[in-house]
Amino acid sequence: MTQKNKQYKLEKGLMLFTQPRSPYFYGKIRFNKKYLTKSFAPIVSRADAELELYAWRDSLFKNDTPSAKTISEETGARSQYIEHEEIINDFQFLEVGRFDPQKKSLEERKISFVEIYGEYNQTEVSNQAHRCLDCGNPYCEWKCPVHNYIPDWLKLVNEGNIIEAAELCHQTNSLPEMCGRVCPQDRLCEGACTLNDGFGAVTIGSTEKYITDKAFEMGWKPDMSYRTWTDKKVAIVGAGPAGIACADVLTRSGVKSHVYDKYQEIGGLLTFGIPEFKLEKKVVKKRRDILEGMGVEFFLGKEIGKDIQFKELYENYDAVFLGMGTYTSLEGGFKGEKLPNVFKALDYLISSTNRLLKIEKDKEKFINLKGKNVIVLGGGDTAMDCNRTAVRQGAKSVKCLYRRDEKNMPGSKREVTNAKEEGVEFEFNIQPIEIIGKEKVEGIKVVRTELGDADQNGRRVPIPIPGSELIIEADAVIIAFGFRASPSDWFKDFNINTQNNGLVLAAEEQKYKFQTSNNKIFSGGDMVRGSDLVVTAIWEGREAAKSIIEYVS
């Protein structure tokens, strides 16, 4: 058995043994308040699991394992060894299945821009947290981009220690309440959960949301009593996840953080790109209150290069962090994209958010798809956001066209399921050729596809099937093909190098992580790695902040 499949952990003379990815049973034996743990191969009944556990215990008694030998030598006689023995079986995952917070009714979901998931109560969240096996090698932590201490805060919330759990969440994550809502847990932490196959993963995301929401309700705020302000200050351009995370770490370390953003609210795409039925904006507002209470200063409605020149920041701060994201929409390159009622995904989502927040500058620019037959092109989470927003606006019909099959959709399975429930129709293996219309959209010409060999990214390439063309009627088309970088004009003036695709060059593997070609300037998030998850932007913002602290010191 390789080291990858088998792990030993030495702790106070006690050998703990785990065999990861044995998803059906996990046992503990405690000797003199010390734990010996083991996970077993597939077992489907409690009786079988108990037999395995006691057989394992008996083998330890015979001193035929290194673990038993270590314990016996430390505790002395076997009588003492047995006297202090306590058997603890973790059968919670057998007795209590996965239980997600209840969704609002479909009738309510289709007409309201509020989060669709309800809340756990303390009993429910405790039961779900107790399902965690506390694996010796927690795959959930490794799969999480910020490497949250997931088993540890699950244990705390199971015990009712909400404030302690919130403190632990914030040790690795600057925005846990948002990650609990918008992370695709099904392909990250929960997808890696040992219980995922057969029993249903622990509800990590919903529990993370509960912890932070409940802690805020209880009055939790970061303890800044230990902090001493330094004479250093850093300018952060962009109040999205990367910028916020950078400011959080810097401020906790006594480095003053001034955050500039062109929008009137913080959050970046958290606020303007993610609809309220996934993330209510009061959640972002609460985080802003927390950050300002910590000492972070925001300068909003200020576009760098237009309202404020970058030179001013460069000369007046000890370092600068760029976290401006990627806001330029990718185009399909086919005829008809410029027709009226063809919209870019982000323009559509921002229009909707501005109306809901009552901050739109020009009411005539509001995009209202009520009563229209809407087609959304794309298969990612942004496409799902557009689909579900159109439903809530009262569109007559909403169809989502994707050029691969459902299995190869890049979006979260949870979001696809929610869209289907709300009435969105999906057409797979269909590729757009041309948007049809004269003075406005009348339909879209498409061709059916089949999947060929995998490309360099491991995804199978869609191949058009000759003679399979058809036209689908539509009144409006939303293009959700993703985003690309849009380097600012002033990058060259300050020696900020980019790749050919416009992404800023700021490698993680160097002395100062995420430092650009200009030593004083750091960058992270989507403008470095391309459009990605909120949680990866948080990770890079935090890591860049650590490098900045070292740099300015």
Question: In which residue ranges do the predicted regions lie?
Answer:
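Basic/aromatic DNA-contact patch characteristic of tyrosine site-specific recombinases
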Residues: 1-75, 80
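Beta1-alpha1 glycine-rich phosphate/pyrophosphate-binding loop at the start
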Residues: 86-87, 91-118, 147-159, 169-170, ...
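FAD-site-proximal beta/loop scaffold in flavoenzymes
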Residues: 88, 338-371, 454-531
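Ferredoxin-type iron-sulfur electron-transfer modules in oxidoreductases and energy-metabolism complexes
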Residues: 109-129, 149-181, 198-227, 352-353
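Short cysteine clusters
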Residues: 132-135, 140, 144, 179, ...
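Feature captures the FAD/FMN-dependent oxidoreductase FAD-binding
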Residues: 164, 228, 233-237, 285-334, ...
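Glycine-rich dinucleotide-binding loop and its adjacent helix/turn
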Residues: 207, 211-228, 286-306, 329-393, ...
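A conserved FAD-binding loop/helix module that cradles the flavin
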Residues: 386, 527-552
